[in-house]
């Protein structure tokens, strides 16, 4: 997130809010994760279903956007995957940062195994990168000097 802020990419936060026992305003589940709170100038969206596209203002923003989004978060097996699939069906470009996301365990399958699988499936719907690789791909490039520099 710090890299995105540093290079001037807009940062948005999306959280689940509903009338359920877990995702209503009175529970700790709707709080931001410590160290990952929005800054005053950043967008906040609230949704009632797993996909970010369940939030009409988010969906409208994506429909007007020319670029794609970089997606990271919790939970990979529900929110991230459903957002990737919705984006794919709308021809929106998504880059999923698999190591900046996490998934829940499902029954007897451990969380890390679920997350590895989600990360592989995500590649069907968007680009999947580790954070360091994505950062390196978005750093400003310096023009080379010498015989192999081109020009």
Regions found by a protein language model. Name each.
Residues 1-10:
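A short, N-terminal amphipathic alpha-helix
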Residues 6-7, 19-151:
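Active-site-adjacent betaalpha module
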